[in-house]
Structure formats: C-alpha cells, structure tokens
From Swiss-Prot:
This is U1 small nuclear ribonucleoprotein 70 kDa. There is a cross-link at K346 (Glycyl lysine isopeptide (Lys-Gly) (interchain with G-Cter in SUMO2)). The modification Phosphotyrosine is found at Y126. Residues 192-201 have a biased composition (Gly residues). GO terms for molecular function: mRNA binding; RNA binding; U1 snRNA binding; U1 snRNP binding. The modification Phosphoserine is found at S226, S268, S320, S410. One of its GO terms (biological process) is regulation of RNA splicing. The gene is SNRNP70. Residues 255-268 have a biased composition (Basic residues). PROSITE patterns: RRM (PS50102). Component of the spliceosomal U1 snRNP, which is essential for recognition of the pre-mRNA 5' splice-site and the subsequent assembly of the spliceosome. SNRNP70 binds to the loop I region of U1-snRNA. Transmembrane segments: none annotated. Residues 48-79, 187-437 are annotated as: Disordered. Major ribonucleoprotein antigen recognized by the sera from patients with autoimmune diseases, such as systemic lupus erythematosus.
C-alpha cells in the first residue's frame, strides 16, 4: 500500500546511502610477518650472577616486633618526660595553689557540664566556702573534671571529706579527698607516676577494677609481701557480693514463704469460717425445729394436763365412781375410794411436768451457750478450746438433766434464773409451782 503514497511520503521510506569502506589501520594477525622468531633464555644464562657471590638476605621486622618496639620507645620517652617534669614540679611555689592547704578539699570525677555555682550550692551545706578553683586545660580551655574547694574553717572541710564522698552531682558521683600536694611530703600526682588510684598501673593483670577513695586507701595501706594484693581484694569483694546476693535471695524466699503462709492461713480461716457458718446454720435450723416441736409438745401437754385436772376434779367430787375405774397413769387396783393416791398422782404429774419444762429450758440455754462459746472460740482461734467444747457438747448430749454438758457460766446462769422458793423465771411463758412436800 506504500506505493500509492505521495512522493513526499515515499521519500521518508527510501533507504539510506551505504557505509563507505575504509582500509584497516593494521594488518590482520594472519597477515603479519615476524622477522625474528621466538627463542628461549638459554643464551642469557651466562649473564646471571653467581649464587655464591649473592649477599645474605636481610631479615624484616614482624608486626608484633614493631608494636613491641614502639611500646618500649614510648615508655622510655615517657620516663624521660616524667623525670624532666619532676625536676620542674613544685606544688608549694605553684601560682594557682592558693589559700590554706589544710582547709582545701579536692573534688574529682566532676561532670564536665558542672559549673562553679553548682559546686558551691552542693558543698555549702557543710560550711561557708572561701574559694573554688576549677581546673581547665591550657590547650583547649575545656574543664578537666576536678576542682579545689577552700573552706573558711577546717572542721567544715573534715565534715565534707566524711560525708560528700560519692555524692551524685549532675548525674555523676564525685570523689572527695584532701589536698595532698602541699600536705603530704614526697607526694606526686598521677601524671608523674604517683596518686592513689590503682586503675592505671599497667595491664589488666595489674590494674584494679573498682576505684574509689576507700578501696585505694586499703590498697596502698595494706601490709604484706604479696606482689598482687588487688587480687585478694577482688576475691574478698566477690565473696562479699556473693554473700549479699545469697542473703537477698534468702530474704526474698522468706518473704515469699511468709506471703504463702498468710495466704494459706487466710484460706484455712475462710474455710473454717464457712464450715462454722454451715454448722451454725444447721444448729439454728435444728434449734428452730426443736423449738417448734417443743412448743407443739408443750401445747399438747397443756391440753392433757387441763383434761387431767378437769377429770381429776370430777373424781374427787364423786369418790364412789372414781373407785371403780383406775386412773390413766397409776397401776390398776391400787386406788381405793378414799385412798390418797389421787393427790399424790397429781403431784407426780406436776413434778414430771416441771422437770420437763426445766429440761427444755436447760436445753435451750445450753444451745444458746454453745453458740456463744463457738463464737468466742472462733474469735480466739484456740484449737484446744474448740476440742474441749466439742467434747463437752458430745458428753452433755446423753445426760438427763443436761447440766454436766454445760460450762460454769451456763450453770451459773441457770442457777440465777431459778428462784429461792423453787420458782423459775417466767421465760417459758408461765410460772411453775413448787412441788408439795
């Protein structure tokens, strides 16, 4: 279909001109001709040097030997510098050391951001301060982390020396000591090979791990020929740390056991309380049933007694008729027409009824006293009392009169409720007459 396009569009589809041919700059590898062919090194062997005439090989320095050499050179150079500075060091003629040396306190390990006003606020609590000198680097002008504080009174310096050591200022615990440069004869600072610290004495086998005023003083003042006393101190410190850890573990276990015992006792108390409440509810239900049955029995006995009294009055009015029929309670054939068994039988009925009422009253009082004793024993938590109460309650259930199962308080209450003439207090709802002689 392109042949039907107009000429201007057909010109766009026309092919380009071919790439012009250029001759190569070099010949191809197979076209090259070598004038001199390859040969070996045999003709040149006679030009080599004789091995017998070669110089001996030079021994190169290894990496370990180079490091040891540099360390040795550094130590020698540092010793020379220390000897030179020792000749120039004189703390008594130092222009920066001013004031009384026995009133000056040395404070180290100070935070680099701590200012002089902050140090003054922290150390003024021990006494009035005369001057504070913070040490700065001469080259960079930055603080070096220690200062000298001069107090107006020597006693204030001693107080700060005792109580300010280990005080945390701006997140760092400072170390407090007296100024030893002008007070101790032959004293040398740490940079000149002296000082009290044992953390920079050498390698890991010589340095101590923990630094501080007390530890370093013990390190320097410890007598004995031991070449490495810090090992004994580290061993003692590790032993003390293990003992403290064991004591903390024992105390923690003791607290856990006490808490478990408290929980166990509380659970046992709750269980005992639930058991006693169930027993108390059962006793109350039993007492309620007993009272209802007693009330019904009492009403029945009252009706029977009224019927007997009513029937007994008819027998006494007509003795001739009563002689033919024997009474209900007495044996047949014993009562005559004029015999005195009728009034005696009534007296026995009254005595029997009185004993029954006394027994019911005693049982009611005994139940009430039992509940009261149970509550008392629950509050006291005495097992012996509870065991004695159970024995008393079990032993008093089979008695007829019910007084042996009662305590002294219950027996006294029962005696107080009974009158001097044989009458009981009107708690039963009616008064009982005394039995005839």
């Amino acid at each position: 279909m392109t042949q039907f396009l107009p000429p201007n569009l057909l010109a766009l589809f026309a092919p380009r001109d071919p790439i012009p041919y250029l001759p190569p700059l070099e010949k191809l590898p197979h076209e090259k001709h070598h004038n001199q062919p390859y040969c070996g090194i045999a003709p040149y062997i006679r030009e080599f040097e004789d091995p017998r005439d070669a110089p001996p090989p030079t021994r190169a320095e290894t990496r370990e030997e180079r490091m040891e050499r540099k360390r040795r050179e550094k130590i020698e150079r540092r010793q020379q510098e220390v000897e030179t500075e020792l000749k120039m060091w004189d703390p008594h003629n130092d222009p920066n050391a001013q004031g009384d040396a026995f009133k000056t306190l040395f404070v180290a390990r100070v935070n680099y951001d701590t200012t002089e006003s902050k140090l003054r606020r922290e150390f003024e609590v021990y006494g009035p301060i005369k001057r504070i000198h913070m040490v700065y680097s001469k080259r960079s002008g930055k603080p070096r982390g220690y200062a000298f504080i001069e107090y107006e009174h020597e006693r204030d310096m001693h107080s700060a020396y005792k109580h300010a050591d280990g005080k945390k200022i701006d997140g760092r615990r400072v170390l407090v000591d007296v100024e030893r440069g002008r007070t101790v004869k032959g004293w040398r600072p740490r940079r000149l090979g002296g000082g009290l610290g044992g953390t920079r004495r050498g390698g890991a086998d010589v340095n101590i791990r923990h630094s501080g005023r007390d530890d370093t003083s013990r390190y320097d003042e410890r007598p004995g020929p031991s070449p490495l006393p810090h090992r004994d101190r580290d061993r003692d410190r590790e032993r003390e740390r293990r003992e403290r850890s064991r004591e903390r573990d024992k105390e923690r276990e003791r607290r856990r056991s006490r808490s478990r015992d408290r929980r166990r006792r509380s659970r046992s108390r709750d269980k005992e309380e639930r058991r006693r409440s169930r027993e108390r509810s059962k006793d109350k239900d039993r007492d309620r049933k007993r009272r209802s049955s007693r009330s019904r029995e009492r009403a029945r006995r009252e009706r029977e007694r009224k019927e007997e009294l009513r029937g007994g009055g008819g027998d006494m009015a007509e003795p001739s008729e009563a002689g033919d029929a024997p009474p209900d309670d007495g044996p047949p054939g014993e009562l005559g027409p004029d015999g005195p068994d009728g009034p005696e039988e009534k007296g026995r009925d009254r005595d029997r009824e009185r004993r029954r009422s006394h027994r019911s009253e005693r049982e009611r009082r005994r139940d009430r006293d039992r509940d009261r004793d149970r509550d008392r024993e629950h509050k006291r938590g005495e097992r012996g009392s509870e065991r004695g109460r159970d024995e008393a309650r079990g032993g008093g259930g089979g008695q007829d009169n019910g007084l042996e199962g009662l305590g002294n308080d219950s027996r006294d209450m029962y005696m107080e409720s009974e009158g001097g003439d044989g009458y009981l207090a009107p708690e039963n709802g009616y008064l009982m007459e005394a039995a005839p002689e």
